[in-house]
């Protein structure tokens, strides 16, 4: 919320060339309730000659009152060739063996790829798939060890990425029940086989889709109110385990 309040100071400054002022909020998905409400007040009565750019990877997570005051501009993802070219231009190197993983997880976004690389996103996703492969019975000792690496203020960025990848994995599992072997763009080896085992048909896909929706909402709320990361992530995995046991 302090960052949002600093916008008032920014808007009080004069523009030397008489042009517009631009405020970029990246990423709006992680605004807590207080910050979102503070932003809403500014959006309701925006300063003159001001443009707000709210970057959101999941627009449905934004407050409806914030969304109603915005225009949606969808940006298409870059092709793999253009993505790697852009990363090369800014001297960001991707390990050759992980290029496919990062291009798919990054969804054609240069910024997202940089973030994934910063927090070892490929390894986090592989770990998630490893736990999903244990279902319907998770190894509690291994899981607690894994979850412990996301605790603490210094690991906030890794925690946010873990949540995104957890949501992605459950959503992809639900798609497997509908698309089967036609699920495209396998991110890691044996991924489709794991998802097909968890979600063999459209009826089961409905259960995973419902879990994906609830899970995303709960985790975003947990982040916004600063719930204990360990408890929040363990609870999420146990809910996934419970869902797998009903199949």
Regions from the language model: what does each represent?
Residues 12-14, 37-53:
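Conserved catalytic/switch belt of AAA+ P-loop NTPases
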Residues 4, 33-37, 160, 230:
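Conserved strand-to-helix beginnings and helix N-cap segments that scaffold or border functional pockets
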Residues 28-31, 40-44, 153, 157:
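Short, surface-exposed loop and linker segments with low hydrophobicity and enrichment for Pro/Ser/Thr
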Residues 3, 23, 27, 31, ...:
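Helical "lid/switch" subdomain of P-loop NTPase nucleotide-binding domains
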Residues 9, 41, 64, 68:
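Conserved adenine-binding aromatic site and its adjacent loop/helix in ATP-hydrolyzing domains
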Residues 48-50, 57-165, 169-247:
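Charged, glycine-rich active-site and insertion segments that engage polyanionic ligands
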Residues 1-34, 196:
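Clamp-loader machinery-focused feature within the broader ASCE/P-loop NTPase space
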């Amino acid at each position: 919320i302090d960052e949002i309040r600093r916008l008032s100071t920014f808007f009080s400054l004069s523009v030397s060339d008489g042009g517009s002022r631009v405020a970029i909020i990246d990423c709006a998905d992680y605004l807590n309730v207080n910050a979102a409400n503070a932003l809403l007040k500014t959006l309701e009565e925006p300063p003159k000659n001001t443009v707000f750019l709210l970057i959101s990877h999941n627009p449905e997570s934004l407050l409806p009152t914030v969304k109603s005051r915005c225009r949606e501009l969808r940006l298409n993802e870059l092709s793999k060739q253009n993505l790697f070219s852009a990363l090369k231009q800014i001297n960001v190197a991707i390990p050759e063996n992980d290029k496919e993983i990062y291009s798919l997880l990054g969804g054609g976004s240069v910024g997202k790829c940089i973030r994934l690389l910063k927090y070892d996103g490929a390894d986090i996703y592989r770990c998630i798939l490893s736990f999903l492969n244990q279902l319907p019975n998770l190894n509690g000792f291994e899981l607690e060890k894994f979850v412990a690496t996301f605790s603490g203020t210094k690991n906030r960025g890794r925690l946010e990425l873990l949540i995104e990848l957890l949501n992605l994995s459950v959503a992809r599992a639900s798609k497997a029940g509908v698309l089967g072997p036609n699920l495209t763009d396998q991110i890691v080896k044996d991924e489709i086989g794991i998802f097909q085992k968890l979600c063999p048909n459209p009826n089961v896909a409905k259960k995973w889709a419902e879990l994906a929706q609830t899970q995303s909402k709960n985790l975003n709320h947990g982040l916004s109110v600063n719930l204990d990361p360990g408890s929040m992530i363990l609870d999420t995995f146990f809910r996934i385990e419970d869902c797998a046991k009903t199949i």
